Amino acid sequence: PYKFFVRQGASDKLLIYLQGGGACWFRQTCDPEMTPSYTLNVANTSYPYFGIFNFAKADNPFKDHTVVYAPYCTGDVHIGASDTIYPPVEEGQKDLVIRHQGRANMQAVLEWTYANVKSPKNIFVTGSSAGAIPSPFYASLIADHYPDARVGQLGDGAGGYRRMNQATRPHEQWGMFNFIKDEKGFEHLNSHDMNYESLYIAAAQ
C-alpha cells in the first residue's frame, strides 16, 4: 500500500511536493538484488522537518501552507503506468516484475487533495530530482482542477536528466504513454521525440 503525508495549514494555501530518489529502466538498476537506483519502499519514509518543511522558521514562505508530501518508490519519476517485466541478465535469474505505478500513486494524492482542500487561492507544486521531472505535468492537472487559483511550479534538480536516445527511453519501460496523451495539453507528445523538457513545454503552453 502507498502512503503520503499531509500537514494541515491554511485552507487557501497549498504546497504539493513530489519526493525524489532515482529511477530505473534496466534489470540491473531495477532489481533489488542487484544495484537498485531508486527507493524500494516507502514504509519507513519519515516526514522531513528541514528546508521548506521547517515550519518553525519565520522566513519560510510556506510555513502557513497546507502541505501534501508524495513519497516515491516506483522508479518511474512518478509517471509510470505499467507492470513491466525485466528478463534475466544473469544465470539463475527469473523474470522480474516491477510495478511502475507512480501515476496511480499520484492519483491517490490528487484525489485526497481535491476532496479535502476545496478552494485554495495559492498553490505551489514542486519536487526534487525525480520529483522535479513530473512536477509541471501535475501542476497542469492541478491548475485545471482549481481554475480560480494562482498556481506556481518549480522543478528542483531535474536538469541532470538530459535528452534521451534510442537506447535509453525510460518512458517506454514505465508505460507513460498509457495515459499521458489523454490529458489536455499533452496530446501531442510522442515516444520518439519525448524528453523531460517536453513536460515543461507542454505545461507552459
Q: For the regions a protein language model found, what residue spans apply to each?
A:
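Glycine-rich nucleophile elbow surrounding the catalytic serine of serine-hydrolase chemistry
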Residues: 128-140
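Active-site machinery of serine-nucleophile hydrolases
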Residues: 7-116
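Short alpha-helical segments and helix-capping/turn motifs at coil-helix boundaries
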Residues: 1-7, 47-57, 137-139, 195-202
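Active-site-proximal beta-strand/loop segments in catalytic clefts of secreted hydrolases
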Residues: 18-21, 70-75, 126-131, 154-159
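Surface cap/lid and interfacial helix-loop subdomains adjacent to catalytic sites
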Residues: 1, 83-84, 97-124, 139-205
